[in-house]
Amino acid sequence: FNELAASGLALRTHGGIRFLEQEVPSVPYGLREEWNIEEKKAIAQEAVKYIRDSHSVMIYGGSTTGHLGFYLTQGRIITNLPDLCRILRMRFPTGDGPQVILTGGEFDFRTGNLEGPALRRSLENYECDVGVASAYGVDETGLIDISDECSEQIALMLGKSSLRIILADHSKFKRKGFCRSLPWNRIH
């Protein structure tokens, strides 16, 4: 409760909290990474089954995609999630794990991602075997996210990948969002 109130997402009340009215709340990464953690780990572990050691992988930062760092062992990774680098550094302190390229961009403290024009420029020269992303929500038409910026970056990273994998825990389904990212017919 205290963390939600401190982040500006909720107001403490007697006996609990009341969420503040926002069109689409951007919950800080530090909170999101703890929610549904066992489910997120299981989803990431399942996703890794589609990624070969020889693959290059583009990973859009998110609280679920970050868990891939606990399961990837080889290959080349391009990501906008600095926390993924932290996880891999802990797992491979001598540097014998995957090669990692961290995109450029401005660090967004709420999302935990690098974002903006520098990210887009840094991706211009790359294409990957596999693209992995999560989103604010998914519905019958496709992916939904919290901003044009996030939606555009997800579309860019997945668009530069041959195989596209979406990671979504149960809380993402039929969630109302703000921006359409990618329709299902562009994710295959």
Where would I find each of the regions flagged by the language model?
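Amphipathic alpha-helical effector-binding/dimerization core
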Residues: 56, 61-88, 92-94, 98-99
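Electropositive phosphate-/nucleotide-binding environments in soluble metabolic enzymes
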Residues: 7, 34-41, 45, 62, ...
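Short conserved AdoMet
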Residues: 52, 73, 159-162
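Conserved phosphate- and dinucleotide-binding cores of soluble alpha/beta proteins
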Residues: 5-6, 12, 83-188
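Alpha-helical segments flanking ligand/cofactor-binding loops in enzyme cores
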Residues: 45-48, 66, 70, 121, ...
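HTH-adjacent hinge/linker in prokaryotic transcriptional regulators
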Residues: 2-60, 71, 93-96
